[in-house]
Amino acid sequence: MAKQKFERTKPHVNIGTIGHIDHGKTTLTAAITKVLHDAHPDLNPFTPFDQIDKAPEEKARGITISIAHVEYQTDARHYAHVDCPGHADYIKNMITGAAQMDGAILVVSATDGPMPQTKEHVLLARQVGVPYIVVALNKADMVDDEEILELVELEVRELLNTYEFPGDDVPVIRVSALKALEGDKEWGEKLLELMAAVDASIPEPERDIDRPFLMPIEDVFTITGRGTVVTGRIERGIVKVNETVEIVGIKPETTTTTVTGVEMFRKLLDEGQAGDNVGLLLRGIKREDVERGQVIVKPKSITPHTVFEARVYILNKDEGGRHTPFFKNYRPQFYFRTTDVTGVVTLPEGTEMVMPGDNTEMTVELIQPIAMEEGLRFAIREGGRTVGAGQVLKVIK
């Protein structure tokens, strides 16, 4: 089958289905592809349920996660949609950011209302930066009583408010994924209504290229007669020749320098941008002034820190993680971007220990500063082996 050309003309948005087990996330994902296929057959292939359900495994920060990816288009947009088969896969995906979501469809069964995993997913969405939610009140064909539907809707809105989402304004669309998947026309219309709500309520993300310049340093070389070159992949923003940049992290002080050259594939460029693997020639910098693990950034856009609060997922032993719990003052390595830094863990009040397979909050104090901001992701390692993954929730100092 010929690969279809990726159309750059439409805005691209990443979304996913979240919610309690058996509330119909995967059925809804399949039904969306069916209804959009019927509405725009030239744009959308239909992806059947069983194809989404046997999601392939992928690795993110050393953690194996099952994630199904489907794509589809509405009139307005191109979507990449992720769906995970298991509850643990969701937690791992949301914490590691394996598949980043610009927004989510929260699936709640009208017959059950919000359940424990509904709450856990909403809390995680709030913490790990899934900024927007649209609600699909699923299995609405199985509830005849209008009052019950209204009560469930109210409960979902209250839950969203509890976790600081705008629960009163979030669109709640009553759907029946199964009926729509079976080809029922009226329920198919409701799914088009759901996607119209997603189009309208989940804004386009800010593109990486529009954010302040940042490049993690992977390697440092000296080129005789020209100076010091640092290489890496530009994470965000643009860097132009002759711009002033800062070198942040690892060392106690931040260094300012000028980029005198940008090279890619041995060619000189005027600028490098997000996604490019480049070498940057730095003025007046000695080989020993810079090292892997530091970042080159737009001045004043990010600062070095050592103490932070984080949300982490700890691998269980079947995933290659620890076999035993850890306690406060645990001292693993924290792998940020390109390097490991040792840190000391403090557990939240009332938590004595963390078991393999748990997800928890913790405070960490690193022995060296790292260029850090809220949302930054990291792996937790012991001697090069990944035992967990996390995300910075709050920078303390």
UniProtKB/Swiss-Prot annotation:
This is Elongation factor Tu. It comes from Parafrankia sp. (strain EAN1pec). One of its GO terms (molecular function) is translation elongation factor activity. Pfam families: GTP_EFTU, GTP_EFTU_D2, GTP_EFTU_D3. Its EC number is 3.6.5.3. Its main location: cytoplasm. PROSITE patterns: G_TR_1, G_TR_2. GTP binds at residues 19-26, 83-87, 138-141.
